[in-house]
Curated annotation (Swiss-Prot):
Localization (cell): Cell membrane; Membrane, Clathrin-coated pit; Cytoplasmic vesicle; Presynapse
Expression by tissue: Brain-specific (peripheral sensory neurons).
PTM annotation, UniProt: Phosphorylation at Ser-774 by GSK3B/GSK3-beta leads to inactivation of receptor-mediated endocytosis in non-neuronal cells. Dephosphorylation at Ser-774, through the EGFR downstream signaling, leads to activation and regulates early stages of clathrin-mediated endocytosis (CME). Phosphorylated by CDK5 leading to synaptic vesicle endocytosis (SVE) activation.
Region described as G2 motif: 64-66
EC class (word): hydrolase
Name under which the protein is recorded: Dynamin-1
Subunit text: Homodimer; homodimerization is mediated by the dynamin-type G domain which promotes assembly-stimulated GTPase activity. Homo-tetramer formed from two dimers in the absence of lipid. Oligomerizes into a helical polymer that self-assembles around the vesicle membrane, when associated to the menbrane through lipid binding.
Domain Dynamin-type G as annotated: residue spans: 28-294
C-alpha cells in the first residue's frame, strides 16, 4: 500500500463522514468516496456482499435499495457491524444487519416502494476486508412499481446526481455482461458527469451468464468501449446459489476457478475477480483521497471562516442569564434607534442600491408627490371665470357697477384655498405610511426576539399615530391661517394696477395675433399606442409640450415635425394596460366630442413606467390640460340648461375686463399661497412627526419597554433562532474536528499515476453489442494509437505471467498476433496486420518496447 500514512487515509475519511453525518451535513460536503451505480438488478449489492463476505443487504424483486447506503469497510481482527443511527450497538449477526437496514429504510420512506436521499451509514469491521468507503445507490429503473410515483425514474436520477456530480467521488459503474454494454445506464451517467473518464471504474458482472459462444474478452482487455481506468470482471452468486445459502467464501473460490478455467479469461485471471477489485478500489480511493485532501482542507477552512464571526456571538451564549438579557435589550434598542436614524437621515455606509430608503421616499413625497397633488387641485379655467363673473354680478346686485369689486377676489381666493386641505392631509397620510414601513424594516433585525419585536413595533407605531393627529391639526391650522387674512400687500402680489395692465396686454395680444416665443414645458419620448397595424402600428416619437400646443417629431433633433395639436379643449384620462402590454398608457381627448388626431377620438400615449406617466400628467396640468372627472358630463348638461356658455359669449366688454382682472389677481395670490404651503408643509411634518418620533425612540422607547412587564418574557428567543444557533455551533465544531483530523495525517506519499487517456468516443455510438468479438465490433476508429485487429474467436491468448520489462504503465497498445491458420475452421479468415491511414503510428515511449513479432499479454491499467 505504500506506508502507514497511506493506510490511514480511508479511516480518516470515515471519521470525517461520521462527524458530518451526525449533524446532517454529509450531503453538502464533498468527501472522497466511491459511488456504486448501475441498472436495476445489475449486481451492485452482490458485489458489495462479496467484499464483506457476508449476506447483509436486502434482496427481492423491483427496487430493493431505496436509500443510499454509505458502507465503510474497516480492516480489523474481529468481525462486527455498527450503524451510525444505533451508536454503541454492535451487530455480530449479519441477518440482523439486513433487518435493521430494511427497518431504517421503511422508517423514512414508508413500506411502499418510495425512495429517499437520506443515507444510512453502516461500518463493517472484518479481517477479510480492505479499508474502503462505498455508497450503494438505488438501481436505475424506468417503470414505476407498486405505489411508486410516475416520476420514479427522475427521482432516482436526481438522487444519483447528488453523489456522482461531486469531483471527489469515484464512480463504480456496474454493468451486466449479458446485456448491451453500449446502452449501459451506469456508463451513460458516468460519461455525462465525468466526460474525461478520470473518475470512472468499470465493473462487468454476470460473465457466467453470457450466451454460449460469446465472451467479454475485448471489454475486459479495455479494447472494446475503453475506459481510462479500465474494467474488472466479477462473477457473483446466482439466485440458485443464494436460495441454497451458498457460502460467499465458496462463491469466491468458484469465481477464481471460473477465470482460471475459461479459455477467454485465463490470461486475465490475476486481474479479475472480487479480491482484485477490492485491492484496486482500495488503492485508487487511497490515491484519490491523497490527491483531493489539499482541496478539501481549503474548502473546510473557507467554510470555517465564513461562519466564525457569527459563531463568536454564540460561544458564550447563556439563554437564561438575566445580565445577558438586559445587555441584549439595551443593544437591540440602541441598534433600532441607529437604524431608524440612518434610514431617515441617510448615511454613507451600507447604502442600499436596490430600493429607496424611508428618508428618500419621504423626500420624494415632499418635493414630487405633494406639489403634484396641489397642481391637480388647481381650478378649471372656464369654471373659475364663470364663478368670478357670478361673484361680480351678485355683489353689484341690481345696481350697475362701475368698479371691480375686491370682495369678488376674496370670495374666489377663499374657495380655492379651501381646496388645499385635501392634498395636505393626503401628504401627512403618505408620510405616516412611509414611517410605519421604515419601523417594520428596522425591526427585522429583532426577529430572533419575536416578543420584543412585536412590542417595539406597537409602541413606536402608537406614538406615530398620536403624532399624526397633532400634525393634521397643525396642517389644518396653516390652511385656516391663510383663510383668515388676505395679505394683498405681499411683495410678490401683482396688485390691482398690474392686474389691470396685464388684462389689457392679453386683450391686445388676442387682437394683434403677434405672440412672443412660447415657453416649452416638457420634452421627451412617448409612444402613440392606438395606431392600427395596417397604418404602421405603435411608434415612438419625440414630443414637445408648450402652454399652447403639443407637437411631435420623428426624433429629438426636432427637424421633421409629424403633427401639432392645440391643447385647447383637451383633457386627460387613464387607459388600462393591454393583456400583453408592459407599457403604462394615458389618453388625450377633446371635450367637444371632436376627433383629436386624424380620425381618432382619442390619442393614446404610452410610457415605460408609471412614474413617467405621472410626470407627463403634471406637465399637462401646467399646460392647462386637466384629468377627466366623473361628473364632467353632468356639469356639461347643466351648463347647457343654464345657458352659461351663451352668457359668457355675450358678456359685455366691461364685465369681461373685470373678470380678467380678478382672474389675474387670484392667479397671483394663489401662487403665493401654494408657495407658502409647499414650503411649510415639509417643515411642519418634520418637526411634529419625524423629528419627534426620532427623539422618542432615543429617549423614551426603552422606558416604555421596561414598563410593559417582565423583561424575561420580552427577551425570549424564537425557536427558529435557537435551532439556527445550535446548528451553527455543531457545524463549527464539526469543521474544527475535521481540520484537526486532516492535520494529523501525513500525505507525503508516492501513488500510482492516473492511467493515460483512451478513446472514449464510443459512448456516442448506439447499439454496439457487448461481449461479441468480431472485426466490426472493435472500438471506433477515432484512436490516438494504431488500430489493433482483434483476436479471432476461439483463439487462446498467451499464458498469464508477468509483463515484459520496460512496458509502459497502463499498457501500450497490444501488438497484433502473427497471422496463421485458425484453429477454428468456422472462424473468419486471417487478418493481415496493417497500419491504418487515419492516424500516424504511435511512438514508443521506451526503448524496451515489445517486439511486434511476439504476442504480448495486455497490461492492466493498475499497478499493484
Amino acid at each position: 500500500m505504500g506506508n502507514r500514512g497511506m493506510e490511514d487515509l480511508i479511516p480518516l475519511v470515515n471519521r470525517l463522514q461520521d462527524a458530518f453525518s451526525a449533524i446532517g451535513q454529509n450531503a453538502d460536503l464533498d468527501l472522497p468516496q466511491i459511488a456504486v451505480v448501475g441498472g436495476q438488478s445489475a449486481g451492485k449489492s452482490s458485489v458489495l456482499e462479496n467484499f464483506v463476505g457476508r449476506d447483509f443487504l436486502p434482496r427481492g424483486s423491483g427496487i430493493v435499495t431505496r436509500r443510499p447506503l454509505v458502507l465503510q469497510l474497516v480492516n480489523s481482527t474481529t468481525e462486527y457491524a455498527e450503524f451510525l443511527h444505533c451508536k454503541g450497538k454492535k451487530f455480530t449477526d449479519f441477518e440482523e444487519v439486513r433487518l435493521e437496514i430494511e427497518a431504517e429504510t421503511d422508517r423514512v420512506t414508508g413500506t411502499n416502494k418510495g425512495i429517499s436521499p437520506v443515507p444510512i451509514n453502516l461500518r463493517v469491521y472484518s479481517p477479510h476486508v480492505l479499508n474502503l468507503t462505498l455508497v450503494d445507490l438505488p438501481g436505475m429503473t424506468k417503470v414505476p412499481v407498486g405505489d411508486q410515483p410516475p416520476d420514479i425514474e427522475f427521482q432516482i436520477r436526481d438522487m444519483l446526481m447528488q453523489f456522482v456530480t461531486k469531483e471527489n467521488c469515484l464512480i463504480l459503474a456496474v454493468s451486466p455482461a449479458n446485456s448491451d454494454l453500449a446502452n449501459s445506464d451506469a456508463l451513460k451517467i458516468a460519461k455525462e458527469v465525468d466526460p474525461q473518464g478520470q473518475r470512472t471504474i468499470g465493473v462487468i458482472t454476470k460473465l457466467d451468464l453470457m450466451d454460449e459462444g460469446t465472451d467479454a474478452r475485448d471489454v475486459l482487455e479495455n479494447k472494446l468501449l475503453p475506459l481510462r481506468r479500465g474494467y474488472i470482471g466479477v462473477v457473483n452468486r446466482s439466485q440458485k446459489d443464494i436460495d441454497g445459502k451458498k457460502d460467499i467464501t465458496a462463491a469466491l473460490a468458484a469465481e477464481r476457478k471460473f477465470f482460471l478455467s475459461h479459455p477467454s479469461y485465463r490470461h486475465l485471471a490475476d486481474r479479475m475477480g472480487t479480491p482484485y477489485l477490492q485491492k484496486v478500489l482500495n488503492q485508487q480511493l487511497t490515491n484519490h483521497i491523497r490527491d483531493t485532501l489539499p482541496g478539501l482542507r481549503n474548502k473546510l477552512q473557507s467554510q470555517l471562516l465564513s461562519i466564525e464571526k457569527e459563531v463568536d456571538e454564540y460561544k458564550n451564549f447563556r439563554p437564561d442569564d438575566p445580565a445577558r438579557k438586559t445587555k441584549a435589550l439595551l443593544q437591540m434598542v440602541q441598534q433600532f434607534a441607529v437604524d431608524f436614524e440612518k434610514r431617515i437621515e441617510g448615511s454613507g455606509d451600507q447604502i442600499d442600491t436596490y430600493e429607496l430608503s424611508g428618508g428618500a421616499r419621504i423626500n420624494r413625497i415632499f418635493h414630487e408627490r405633494f406639489p403634484f397633488e396641489l397642481v391637480k387641485m388647481e381650478f378649471d379655467e372656464k369654471e373659475l371665470r364663470r364663478e368670478i363673473s357670478y361673484a361680480i354680478k351678485n355683489i353689484h346686485g341690481i345696481r350697475t357697477g362701475l368698479f371691480t369689486p375686491d370682495l369678488a377676489f376674496e370670495a374666489t381666493v377663499k374657495k380655492q384655498v379651501q381646496k388645499l386641505k385635501e392634498p395636505s392631509i393626503k401628504c401627512v397620510d403618505m408620510v405616516v405610511s412611509e414611517l410605519t414601513s421604515t419601523i417594520r424594516k428596522c425591526s427585522e433585525k429583532l426577529q430572533q426576539y419575536p416578543r420584543l419585536r412585536e412590542e417595539m413595533e406597537r409602541i413606536v407605531t402608537t406614538h406615530i399615530r398620536e403624532r399624526e393627529g397633532r400634525t393634521k391639526e397643525q396642517v389644518m391650522l396653516l390652511i385656516d391661517i391663510e383663510l383668515a387674512y388676505m395679505n394683498t400687500n405681499h411683495e410678490d402680489f401683482i396688485g390691482f394696477a398690474n392686474a389691470q395692465q396685464r388684462s389689457n396686454q392679453m386683450n391686445k395680444k388676442k387682437t394683434s395675433g403677434n405672440q412672443d416665443e412660447i415657453l416649452v414645458i416638457r420634452k421627451g419620448w412617448l409612444t402613440i399606442n392606438n395606431i392600427g397595424i395596417m397604418k404602421g402600428g405603435s411608434k415612438e416619437y419625440w414630443f414637445v409640450l408648450t402652454a399652447e400646443n403639443l407637437s411631435w417629431y420623428k426624433d429629438d433633433e426636432e427637424k421633421e415635425k409629424k403633427y401639432m395639436l392645440s391643447v385647447d379643449n383637451l383633457k386627460l384620462r387613464d387607459v388600462e394596460k393591454g393583456f400583453m402590454s408592459s407599457k403604462h398608457i394615458f389618453a388625450l381627448f377633446n371635450t367637444e366630442q371632436r376627433n383629436v388626431y386624424k380620425d381618432y377620438r382619442q390619442l393614446e400615449l404610452a410610457c415605460e413606467t408609471q412614474e413617467e406617466v405621472d410626470s407627463w400628467k403634471a406637465s399637462f396640468l401646467r399646460a392647462g390640460v386637466y384629468p377627466e372627472r366623473v361628473g364632467d358630463k353632468e356639469k356639461a348638461s347643466e351648463t347647457e340648461e343654464n345657458g352659461s356658455d351663451s352668457f359668457m359669449h355675450s358678456m359685455d366688454p366691461q364685465l369681461e375686463r373685470q373678470v380678467e382682472t380678478i382672474r389675474n389677481l387670484v392667479d397671483s395670490y394663489m401662487a403665493i399661497v401654494n408657495k407658502t404651503v409647499r414650503d411649510l408643509m415639509p417643515k411642519t411634518i418634520m418637526h411634529l412627526m419625524i423629528n419627534n418620533t426620532k427623539e422618542f425612540i432615543f429617549s423614551e422607547l426603552l422606558a416604555n419597554l421596561y414598563s410593559c412587564g417582565d423583561q424575561n418574557t420580552l427577551m425570549e428567543e424564537s425557536a427558529e433562532q435557537a435551532q439556527r444557533r445550535d446548528e451553527m455551533l455543531r457545524m463549527y465544531h464539526a469543521l474544527k474536528e475535521a481540520l484537526s483530523i486532516i492535520g494529523d495525517i501525513n500525505t507525503t506519499t508516492v501513488s500510482t499515476p492516473m492511467p493515460p487517456p483512451v478513446d472514449d468516443s464510443w459512448l456516442q455510438v448506439q447499439s454496439v453489442p457487448a461481449g461479441r468479438r468480431s472485426p466490426t465490433s472493435s472500438p471506433t476508429p477515432q484512436r490516438r494509437a494504431p488500430a489493433v485487429p482483434p483476436a479471432r474467436p476461439g483463439s487462446r491468448g498467451p499464458a498469464p505471467g508477468p509483463p515484459p520489462a520496460g512496458s509502459a504503465l497502463g499498457g501500450a497498445p497490444p501488438v497484433p498476433s502473427r497471422p496463421g491458420a485458425s484453429p477454428d475452421p468456422f472462424g473468419p479468415p486471417p487478418q493481415v496486420p496493417s497500419r491504418p491511414n487515419r492516424a500516424p503510428p504511435g511512438v514508443p515511449s521506451r526503448s524496451g518496447q515489445a517486439s511486434p513479432s511476439r504476442p504480448e499479454s495486455p497490461r492492466p491499467p493498475f499497478d499493484l
